[in-house]
């Protein structure tokens, strides 16, 4: 028997809820306020079938462009034929959570500003570029302290 090509195909693990989190949605999901221009993460809740986005958008970060009483309009960028297309989705609140993108970005900006201020006081120029992890420095390996050479045994015929 051939497999189906349904709307929720191959989502058994993707939409599964974590251990001890099954059941109803917590009230904090509904009480969170969203404003136009905020960044949100689309995380599909498999127990809520209404307003569920397509599986491709699970885990994507988007920008809120519309707020309704029970749903949120989110702009997500999707690659189609080698170019980015702006997709506008309306997703129910159960499938959305606030994103930490802005908080991480603002922390980095504050650290950069502080480093620049310290550099100006010292009269040095500070680079705020993010560098990839550099290779480890060379280390000389030393032998064990109590190393004993192998003993010579006589041959057995």
UniProtKB/Swiss-Prot annotation:
Family: Belongs to the eukaryotic ribosomal protein eL21 family.
GO cellular component, one term: ribonucleoprotein complex
Native organism: Tetrahymena thermophila (strain SB210)
One Gene Ontology MF term: structural constituent of ribosome
Protein name per its UniProtKB record: Large ribosomal subunit protein eL21
Pfam family, one: Ribosomal_L21e
InterPro entries associated with the record: Ribosomal_eL21 (IPR001147), Ribosomal_eL21_CS (IPR018259), Ribosomal_eL21_sf (IPR036948), Translation_prot_SH3-like_sf (IPR008991)
GO BP of this protein: translation
Gene that produces this protein: RPL21
């Amino acid at each position: 028997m051939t497999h189906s090509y349904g709307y929720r195909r191959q989502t058994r693990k993707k939409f599964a809820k974590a251990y001890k989190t099954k059941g109803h949605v917590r009230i904090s999901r509904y009480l969170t306020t969203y404003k136009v221009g905020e960044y949100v993460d689309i995380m599909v809740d498999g127990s809520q079938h209404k307003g569920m986005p397509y599986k491709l958008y699970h885990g994507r970060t988007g920008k809120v462009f519309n707020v309704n009483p029970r749903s949120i309009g989110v702009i997500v960028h999707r690659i189609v034929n080698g170019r980015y297309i702006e997709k506008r989705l309306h997703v129910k609140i159960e499938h959305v959570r606030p994103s930490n993108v802005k908080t991480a970005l603002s922390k980095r900006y504050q650290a950069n500003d502080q480093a620049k201020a310290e550099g100006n006081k010292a009269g040095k120029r500070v680079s705020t570029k993010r560098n990839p992890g550099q290779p480890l420095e060379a280390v000389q390996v030393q032998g064990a302290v109590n190393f004993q050479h192998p003993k010579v045994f006589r041959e057995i015929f």
